């Protein structure tokens, strides 16, 4: 395992009493983010509704890294609630509050309580590219095939 990366974090007043994001197991890749909705209230996501849920946190991610907001698998499996723009990107130069865009794909309203774990934060390295315009590109076996062109039929099936 590599050396831990230091991330600056600032709690906003509406999230000051909540625990900081934390890894929930020794092998966890993501830090769990909590909902910083008003104390004593709940946020209800109706079926098909999307909402930006506050975390009460501002991050200082080092240059050459990003934060990725990803769904919690349990919320998706049990309630159909997921991060709509997964993975959401937090750029290293962003200094606003981290918000999690959740959507309820489930059939029932879903209530989010203050302090509930709503998403995972993954810190990842970023590779910046330099684009070079050209008149021709190297040929490949795949060519311009896309949208299912590399999928294989199951054994005994014929692709149509």
From Swiss-Prot:
Substrate binds at residues 72-74, 85, 89-91. One of its GO terms (biological process) is dUTP catabolic process. Keywords: Hydrolase, Magnesium, Metal-binding, Nucleotide metabolism. It catalyses: dUTP + H2O = dUMP + diphosphate + H(+). Its EC number is 3.6.1.23. InterPro entries: dUTPase, dUTPase-like, dUTPase-like_sf, dUTPase_trimeric. GO terms for molecular function: dUTP diphosphatase activity; magnesium ion binding. Its cofactor is Mg(2+). It comes from the Bacteria. Pfam families: dUTPase. Belongs to the dUTPase family. This enzyme is involved in nucleotide metabolism: it produces dUMP, the immediate precursor of thymidine nucleotides and it decreases the intracellular concentration of dUTP so that uracil cannot be incorporated into DNA. HAMAP family: dUTPase_bact. This is Deoxyuridine 5'-triphosphate nucleotidohydrolase. The gene is dut.
């Amino acid at each position: 395992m590599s050396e831990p990366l230091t991330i600056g974090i600032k709690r906003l007043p509406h999230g000051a009493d909540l625990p900081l994001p934390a890894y929930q197991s020794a092998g966890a890749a993501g830090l769990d983010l909590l909902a910083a909705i008003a104390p004593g209230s709940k946020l209800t996501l109706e079926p098909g509704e999307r909402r930006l849920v506050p975390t009460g946190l501002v991050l200082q991610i080092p240059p050459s890294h990003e934060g990725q907001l990803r769904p919690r698998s349990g919320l998706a499996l049990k309630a159909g609630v997921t991060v709509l723009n997964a993975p959401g990107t937090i750029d290293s130069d962003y200094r606003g509050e981290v918000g999690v865009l959740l959507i309820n794909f489930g059939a029932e309203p879903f209530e989010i309580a203050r302090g509930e774990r709503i998403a995972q934060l993954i810190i990842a390295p970023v590779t910046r590219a330099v684009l070079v315009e050209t008149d021709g590109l190297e040929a490949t076996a795949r060519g311009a095939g896309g949208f299912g062109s590399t999928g294989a039929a199951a054994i005994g099936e014929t692709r149509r």
